[in-house]
A protein has these predicted regions:
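Alpha-helical transmembrane segments and their immediate juxtamembrane cytosolic regions
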Residues: 1-230
Length: 230
């Protein structure tokens, strides 16, 4: 099937990921017994990983792209800590750190593979190992497995039969990153990803930064509600 005939663009995927993430975090903070909300939320992370991989491939300014992720990762940390019931902790870091590490690994691997000299290819394995271990050490959301999931989407984006490879890779991710069987519902994220047409959809600076800001703003609001209202 021609990708251009598929119904979902990048904007649609972003909105779907945001809505499912919001439902997930509402379940985590306000309605801890509503397991269905956590199940719905399993779709969010794979879609975000896919979007980061697409962003890495199409951005015209890698430094600015990485800087945005870094700035919002730092800004999100206080709200993320509050969502976990503390004002400050270094025990667990928010998901934007995972996505940032994933993006950096993708670019290093891409650079290493396009290099003609052997020494240029060697950093690929090192970048993957460092990205994985750093995410594990920092205890970012989804850890090193999340970094590898971003890389999987990035490296297979032009591969024949990519949807099958991505589905299998996502299944391995679900098995490795969590003992909870509900994590397997993340496989459903491949349905909207399979319907992606490669187009950006409506975009603009305000909307772009609004998507980034949504993460710290919504978890801060939910955290305050959980602490002082519910």
């Amino acid at each position: 099937m021609n990708e251009k005939t598929l119904p979902l663009n990048s904007l649609h995927l972003k909105l779907l990921a945001m809505v499912t993430m919001l439902i997930d975090h509402m379940g985590a903070t306000l309605f801890p017994y509503a397991l269905w909300m956590r199940c719905v939320g399993r779709l969010a992370f794979p879609i975000f990983c896919f979007l980061i991989a697409e962003g890495c491939a199409h951005t015209r300014d890698k430094k600015r792209y990485a800087a945005r992720l870094l700035v919002f990762a730092v800004l999100s940390e206080p709200a993320f800590d509050l969502m976990h019931g503390v004002w400050f902790t270094m025990d667990h870091q928010n998901v934007l750190w995972t996505l940032l590490l994933g993006a950096l690994v993708c670019w290093v691997v891409d650079w290493a593979q396009t290099g003609a000299a052997l020494w240029q290819r060697l950093p690929a394995e090192a970048a993957i190992a460092v990205g994985f271990l750093l995410a594990q050490w920092l205890n970012t959301d989804y850890g090193g497995w999340g970094v590898l999931l971003v890389l999987l989407f990035y490296m297979t984006r032009r591969t024949k039969g990519k949807l099958v490879i991505q589905l299998l890779g996502l299944g391995v991710f679900c098995w490795l990153c969590s003992p909870w069987r509900g994590q397997l519902l993340a496989l459903l994220a491949m349905l909207p990803i399979a319907l992606y047409n490669g187009e950006r959809g409506f975009s603009g600076k305000a909307l772009q930064y609004g998507f980034y800001a949504f993460y710290p703003v919504h978890i801060l609001i939910l955290s305050v509600l959980a602490q002082y209202v519910f």
